[in-house]
Amino acid sequence: MSTLRLEDLRQYSDSLRTRQGETLNVRFAEPRNTEELQHYFRSLSTRSRYNRFFGAISELPKGLLHDFLDVGERERFTVVATMMVDGFETIVAEMRYALHAETAAVEFGLSVDDRWHGHGIATALLKNLECRAAALRAEHIFGETLRSNETMISLARKSGFAFVNHPDDWKLVRFDKKIAVAPKDIPCASWRLAALSRQADSPSASA
């Protein structure tokens, strides 16, 4: 079980910088984001949606939308990355990740709005994910993608992931990376708050 306290989701928000210097706000998705999230997925190109879900969909089915917004359920989390566009907070990327405690691993999937490709948003999200995964006491992160998804494969390779054959589907490839974030750096809110929570729950804290 994770040490995250999810009563106030906004405390786990992070402010990142893209490769081009833009401010990227990363926060957990909330029920109030239902329409925004659906609009985001509808605005993706057909290819981007296919690459994200390994199938043809035009929007999130009702059940999957519920899962995306039910942050923390079964140790699954969804974050949205937003930027100010024409004066409005706009979702430009999303990432969903799940903790597999039995293997100390976090599995993830992500997408970036086609109009914002090339800004380094996915790279920033992956770096942030390492910290979020470490807060869950994971030791490595992994993802899967279609062998035809050259963009994701290139991103994973540049981000230091090792590639292995998928155990169940020849059309997919799996990539895995050992988490190399130093605890002393505390580069994200999730890690800092998890550390404080463990400290407060330790026997020495109440002695």
Positions of PLM-derived features:
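Long, contiguous binding/interaction regions
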Residues: 1-207
